[in-house]
Amino acid sequence: MIYQMQMPAKIEVDEATHTDQYGRFIAQPLERGYGVTLGNMMRRVLLASLPGTAITGIKVDGVFHEFSSIEGVREDVPEIVLNLKKVRFKSTCKRSCKTTLSIVGPKDFTAGDIVAQEGEFEVLNKDLYIATVNEGSTLNIDVYIGRGRGYTPAEESRPDSMPIGYIAIDAIYTPIRNVKFAVENTRVGQRTDYEKMVLDVETDGSITPDDSISLAGRIINEHVTFFANFSPTEEEFTEEEYKQQDDEFETMRRLLNTKIEDLDLSVRSHNCLRLAEIDTIGDLVSRKEDELLNYKNFGKKSLTELKEQLEKFELKFGMDITRYQMKG
């Protein structure tokens, strides 16, 4: 007989304190020791593994290194860099982009002046102060913005080919401002040695607390699945079965690498996928339905059309395609 471990029926939400940027989540009852185990896992993944958008570098006219001062600007480059690290974005782009700004004085340069040239991102903390440009002066600055996870120091975020005067910035990608958890005792029947784990999550507004813990949970689940599916004994296959398995694997990999434009889709669906930077069938099936519906101009009609196309290949949304080692 397998011992049945005590598990939470559901995750409770503290509705009294819940906002778009803060959430308190309660998991109970848990077996002794699992409060700390789950709390640590969630905290680490939330802080280090969730994707986000950040400024990765700048280029200022007339400036050739990061310790310079800028004529007609009150702040020097190190102060401006420190302020730019605090800018928070909401973005669905996967690739890096650049925006060019020309700030004419007299003016306080704020984060709201950083505008996407093609709508790739939105600044969330628009009132954040960056610098003051004096009367009669102009600050011409290129701002480089990228996607990533957690935190990447400046020396690791430098692109392979940099323009002269490019200044790399420590990129704080994580959309999570703060995470903490506490473990308390809780009662089940007559037993009082079970645990309750309380998880507090604060985000920068680019993702809700609910979505952040859901994404963190999926990341953890994808990793522990390898252990759950582990078998110490290898099945014996005939040479013919091995060949058939290899052929099926290669067929699936080629299918997942098929370009979206090769599908028989409406112009509207093609445009929606292009704007979402979904280039291959593999990119598409790795997304969940609710994730697609969050993209701009992507509606249920487009979703139904895509479902019908995927069903032709016996594919579906939300597939785990990591084993096929997709190439760019």
From Swiss-Prot:
One of its GO terms (cellular component) is DNA-directed RNA polymerase complex. Its EC number is 2.7.7.6. InterPro entries: DNA-dir_RNA_pol_insert, DNA-dir_RNA_pol_RpoA/D/Rpb3, DNA-dir_RpoA, RBP11-like, RNAP_asu_C, RNApol_insert_sf. It is an enzyme of class 2 (transferase). Residues 247-328 are annotated as: Alpha C-terminal domain (alpha-CTD). It holds the Pfam family RNA_pol_A_bac. It comes from the Bacteria. GO terms for molecular function: DNA binding; DNA-directed RNA polymerase activity; protein dimerization activity. It catalyses: RNA(n) + a ribonucleoside 5'-triphosphate = RNA(n+1) + diphosphate. The keyword Transcription applies. Residues 1-231 are annotated as: Alpha N-terminal domain (alpha-NTD). Keywords: DNA-directed RNA polymerase, Nucleotidyltransferase, Transcription, Transferase. Homodimer. The RNAP catalytic core consists of 2 alpha, 1 beta, 1 beta' and 1 omega subunit. When a sigma factor is associated with the core the holoenzyme is formed, which can initiate transcription. DNA-dependent RNA polymerase catalyzes the transcription of DNA into RNA using the four ribonucleoside triphosphates as substrates. Belongs to the RNA polymerase alpha chain family. NCBIfam families: PRK05182.1-2, PRK05182.2-5, rpoA. This is DNA-directed RNA polymerase subunit alpha. The gene is rpoA.
